Amino acid sequence: MSKILIVNSVYYTEIANLLLEGATDKFKGNNIGYEIIKAPGTFEIPAAILFAVKGKNTNYDGYLALGCVIRGETDHYKYVCKGVIEGLNAIVMHHAIPLGMGIITADSKDKALIRADKNKKNVGGHAASTVLHMIDLHNKLK
C-alpha cells in the first residue's frame, strides 16, 4: 500500500477542507494510506514537503500539495504563486519524487470554492489522482 504525505494550507479554511475532502475520498477509494500536515499558508507548502523529503524518519511514496491563493489588490498574489510553483518544481526535479499539485489560483473566493468542491471541479481529487499516477510511473521507471 502506498503512503502519501498531504500538506494542506489552512489559510482559507473552507477551501482547505474541500480540497482535502476531494483528495482523501480518492485515496480511500484506492486503499491508499496518508498522513496530513497543515501549513499556515500556501507559500509554506514547498518547505514543509522538503522537510519531509529530507527527514530521516519519514518514508512516503508520494506527496500532495493542497492550497489556494486568491488574487488581491497588490502584486503579492503573483509572487506567492510564482514562489509556490517554482518551489514545488525544484523539489520534484532535485529529489525525483512523485507529487500531485492541488494549488488553486483564483480571482475570487467564489471561484476558488467552485474549483475546490468535489462535486464541481474537484481540484483536490484530481491532484490525488495525479500523485497516484506519478507513483506508478516512478515505480515502473526506477
UniProtKB/Swiss-Prot annotation:
The active site is at 76 (proton donor). InterPro entries: LS (IPR034964), LS/RS (IPR002180), LS/RS_sf (IPR036467). Pfam families: DMRL_synthase (PF00885). CDD domains: Lumazine_synthase-I (cd09209). It is an enzyme of class 2 (transferase). GO terms for cellular component: cytosol; riboflavin synthase complex. 5-amino-6-(D-ribitylamino)uracil binds at residues 11, 42-44, 68-70, 101. The keyword Transferase applies. One of its GO terms (biological process) is riboflavin biosynthetic process. Pathway: Cofactor biosynthesis; riboflavin biosynthesis; riboflavin from 2-hydroxy-3-oxobutyl phosphate and 5-amino-6-(D-ribitylamino)uracil: step 1/2. (2S)-2-hydroxy-3-oxobutyl phosphate binds at residues 73-74, 115. It catalyses: (2S)-2-hydroxy-3-oxobutyl phosphate + 5-amino-6-(D-ribitylamino)uracil = 6,7-dimethyl-8-(1-D-ribityl)lumazine + phosphate + 2 H2O + H(+). Keywords: Riboflavin biosynthesis, Transferase. GO terms for molecular function: 6,7-dimethyl-8-ribityllumazine synthase activity. Belongs to the DMRL synthase family. Catalyzes the formation of 6,7-dimethyl-8-ribityllumazine by condensation of 5-amino-6-(D-ribitylamino)uracil with 3,4-dihydroxy-2-butanone 4-phosphate. This is the penultimate step in the biosynthesis of riboflavin. This is 6,7-dimethyl-8-ribityllumazine synthase. The gene is ribH.
